[in-house]
Amino acid sequence: MVMGLGVLLLVFMLGLGLTPPTLAQDNSRYTDFLAQHYDPKPQGRDDRYCESIMRRRGLTSPCKGINTFIHGSKRSIKAICENKNGNPHRENLRISKSSFQVTTCKLHGGSPWPPCHYRATADFRNIVVACENGLPVHLDQSIFRRL
């Protein structure tokens, strides 16, 4: 009986180590995506907006070179990962069927250390994301296209 419990405990412990990532881990990547790229109701979309939001989101130590904020509903952004608002795009990416209001903040000046100065570009664009388990987890800056 003791040997049977030991084997059962061993199998249980091994099973814990071999299980796939939990939904909570998946949601943390989505949460990180939102923290870095989502701002539903921006207060202005100029250089001051960029400097303020980049600082508030912790993207200024060191100064991040470029970051894009998406202004739209979470539902429409998540829908890119489905056929509702997204199509396959290149390897493991999806492109939105509709355009989104975005603000891209680009570092202006030579130093990567604060104080960081940003230039804002406000636009409407289709966006390209990487998805995991039906949630956006990465915004692909390099293949944006203007409409």
UniProtKB/Swiss-Prot annotation:
Its EC number is 3.1.27.-. GO terms for cellular component: angiogenin-PRI complex; basement membrane; cytoplasm; cytoplasmic stress granule; endocytic vesicle; extracellular space; nucleolus; nucleus. This is Angiogenin. Secreted ribonuclease that can either promote or restrict cell proliferation of target cells, depending on the context. Endocytosed in target cells via its receptor PLXNB2 and translocates to the cytoplasm or nucleus. Under stress conditions, localizes to the cytoplasm and promotes the assembly of stress granules (SGs): specifically cleaves a subset of tRNAs within anticodon loops to produce tRNA-derived stress-induced fragments (tiRNAs), resulting in translation repression and inhibition of cell proliferation. tiRNas also prevent formation of apoptosome, thereby promoting cell survival. It comes from the Eukaryota. TRNA binds at residues 45-46, 105, 127. The active site is at residues 37, 138. Belongs to the pancreatic ribonuclease family. It holds the Pfam family RnaseA. Homodimer. Interacts with RNH1; inhibiting ANG ribonuclease activity. Interacts with PCNA. The modification Pyrrolidone carboxylic acid is found at residue 25. CDD domains: RNase_A_canonical (cd06265). Keywords: Angiogenesis, Cytoplasm, Developmental protein, Differentiation, Disulfide bond, DNA-binding, Endonuclease, Hydrolase, Nuclease, Nucleus, Protein synthesis inhibitor, Pyrrolidone carboxylic acid, Secreted, Signal, Stress response. GO terms for molecular function: actin binding; copper ion binding; DNA binding; endonuclease activity; heparin binding; protein homodimerization activity; RNA nuclease activity; signaling receptor binding. GO terms for biological process: actin filament polymerization; angiogenesis; antibacterial humoral response; antimicrobial humoral immune response mediated by antimicrobial peptide; defense response to Gram-positive bacterium; hematopoietic stem cell proliferation; innate immune response; negative regulation of apoptotic process. PROSITE patterns: RNASE_PANCREATIC. Has weak tRNA ribonuclease activity by itself due to partial autoinhibition by its C-terminus, which folds into a short alpha-helix that partially occludes the substrate-binding site. In absence of stress, the ribonuclease activity is inhibited by RNH1 in the cytoplasm. In response to stress, dissociates from RNH1 in the cytoplasm and associates with cytoplasmic ribosomes with vacant A-sites: ribosomes directly activate the tRNA ribonuclease activity of ANG by refolding the C-terminal alpha-helix. In response to stress, the angiogenic activity of ANG is inhibited by RNH1 in the nucleus. A motif (Nucleolar localization signal) lies at residues 55-59. Residues 1-24 form the signal peptide. It comes from Pongo pygmaeus.
